[in-house]
Amino acid sequence: METGRSRGGGAAVSERGGGARAGVCGRQEQAGALAADMDSHCECAAETPAAEPPSGKINKAAFKLFKKRKSGGTMPSIFGVKNKGDGKSSGPTGMVRSRTHDGLAEVLVLEGSKKEEPPGGSDHSGARPIPGPPKPSGPGLGSLASSSVAKSHSFFSLLKKNGRSETGKGDHAEASKAGGKQKRGLKGIFSSMRWHRRDKRGKEEEEKAVRAAGPGNLVLPGSLTASLECVKEEPPRAARRPDSPGQDASRHAAGEPAGGEQAPASAESAPERICLEAGSPTGSGDQSSRGEDAEGHRREEKPGAALESGAGEVQAAEDASKTGDVPIKTVPLVDSEGGSGRASAVPDPSSVDPPSDPSADRICLMFSDVTSLKSFDSLTGCGDIIADPEEEAGPSCDKHVPGPGKPVLSKKNASVVAYQGGGEEMASPDQVDDTYLPEFWDMLSQTEDQGQGTQEGAAKAATASDIKLAPETSSDTRCGEAAKDMSSVKRRRLHRIPIESQQKEEPKHPEKEHQEGVPNSDEGYWDSTTPGPEEESISNSSSSKKVVIPRDSDSGDALCDLYVEPEASPATLPATEDPPCLSRLKPVSPGTITCPLRTPGSLLKDSKIPISIKHLSNLPSSHPVVHQQPARSEVPRTKIPVSKVLVRRVSNRGLAGTTIRAAACHDSAKKL
């Protein structure tokens, strides 16, 4: 029935086509004439399918191709609007609706053929043999495969030719197509979409190779193909996420460069790939092989643009699919991770090394701060207190240990400048206590034994041991020897200090008056980190006074006697060897050490020890200074916070002899 109607309608159409085509020959490009021809076909086809009227409207704008293609899709109402707009706006180019680049090529070729066909009225007879293929395709349209064929490029061209020839065969194809449309449901639509893409691969990919770059693919397909692309692109995306990156690369490289249709083609296989993946763990390999096969077919079908635009990409995709891009992508990931790992690995050794270096650096800075304060009238009042008496005695100790002492002085002169004021706290002996007190006490025990055997052997150990064995007498003799040895250097620094020492000695008479103001003066010096030279000299005198009083109270009368004896000599002979001895004797007393060390506030922490042993606590904290230099040379990396406990032990040990020994050691350290 439908075929008879379509044939009858085809006869009527042919009759109309006789006159209409004659008039249309001149104005084929105009959408009105085409709409008239399409209306005739629409009437014939609209008799059977209820969905034909919207498709008929589309056909007016799209040369029946939209109608048939629309009939191929059971969603004419939805996409019909898009097709209507596209077809009407595009007119004869409405055929461009095909999402693929082939659609563009087909539009150009078909339009050219249209122009050629209508002028020759004999084209109808010539076109009739052409629709012969549509007949087999027509029954095929009834099935899902037929719908895909209808959407195929060749069938589109045949449909266009049939529509133009308006032969009964073309109408019959339309009728059969309409019947197929009615049979198809949503399942048929989706299946036709998938099949259409698969079939189109071979047919349209040839023209796609020519039209490799077609940004309007998605725009053109406003029909089911567009929706199919959208629908299928989404599942492939989901599939791409679980799929190996190799598959993604193969899809992008092989599918996209060739054209938008290849990607959908791969998208069609994507759902199957997903199923395969879910079914078997080797689904990824199967997918990659399929991608390769599809790509292989695509390559064969795409001799031109595929080789030009995506040959390298396709090869890369094949390699990716064969080798699996998982390792490839993972390789950059591994590289990035490896780089980060390398970076992390690098910081690890660097973090390990710097602590060791900073420990030595901190030691150097600590020595430099102490020595710089000693050798230089540091801007800090405390530094001034330490500096003047120790500058005199410092050179002798420096000569005994010129290697570590002098370079430290040179290094830390600059550092002292940076650490003026609070810098002293930075290099306070607390840090030294944390790191070197254990070693220092060990060194003290060793140096006592060694000092007895070799007082002059190991410079630092000898000086410390001599002072420890006989804090009073050895300090005098030691000062004399050091003064003789370093008379020249002493004189140089003595020239710097004689005036200051005299000033110190002069105000020493009213020492008792300054005794009460000692702590306040220390605080004042600490607060004013940069006193003027006059202030420095005054502070030196006051500091010497301060030193004298604690010596009397803490270290005993012997130290006071020693200290009182030098008072006369330095005033008389500042540049002679005696003043250095006196100055050295001064630092020997713990008072000199305690005053400057108290000010930094680091020793305040050590002041936890009972007041009677404050000097001991201060001295052990300063003792590490003595052995810090040798520690730098011997064991620069010693991080032992237990040193504070050792300081407490020292306080428990607290004996007058030990205090004097510690004072002597600290003096030697300051000299260094």
UniProtKB/Swiss-Prot annotation:
Q: Which GO terms describe its biological process?
A: ectoderm development; negative regulation of canonical Wnt signaling pathway; Wnt signaling pathway
> Which residues get modified to Phosphoserine?
154, 223, 227, 244, 284, 356, 359
> Keywords, A to Z?
Cell membrane, Lipid-binding, Membrane, Phosphoprotein, Wnt signaling pathway
> Which cysteines does the record link by disulfide bonds?
none
Which ranges are annotated Low complexity under compositional bias? 142-158, 255-269, 343-354, 446-457
Q: Which residues form the signal peptide?
A: none
User: So which domain of life are we looking at?
Assistant: Eukaryota
Region annotation Disordered: residue ranges?
Answer: 1-23, 74-360, 443-560
Which GO terms of the molecular function aspect are on file? phosphatidylinositol-4,5-bisphosphate binding
Gene Ontology cellular component terms for the protein in this record: plasma membrane
Membrane topology (UniProt): Peripheral membrane protein
- Kindly list the places in or outside the cell where this protein is found, as annotated in its UniProt entry: Cell membrane
The subunit field of the Swiss-Prot or TrEMBL record says: Interacts with APC.
Please list the residue ranges that the record marks as compositionally biased, kind Basic and acidic residues. Answer: 163-175, 201-210, 230-254, 289-303, 478-488, 502-516
Task: State the gene name recorded for this protein.
Answer: Amer2
- Stretches of Gly residues bias are at 1-21
Q: What is its main location?
A: membrane
Similarity comment: Belongs to the Amer family.
Protein name (database record):
APC membrane recruitment protein 2
Q: What does this protein do?
A: Negative regulator of the canonical Wnt signaling pathway involved in neuroectodermal patterning. Acts by specifically binding phosphatidylinositol 4,5-bisphosphate (PtdIns(4,5)P2), translocating to the cell membrane and interacting with key regulators of the canonical Wnt signaling pathway, such as components of the beta-catenin destruction complex.
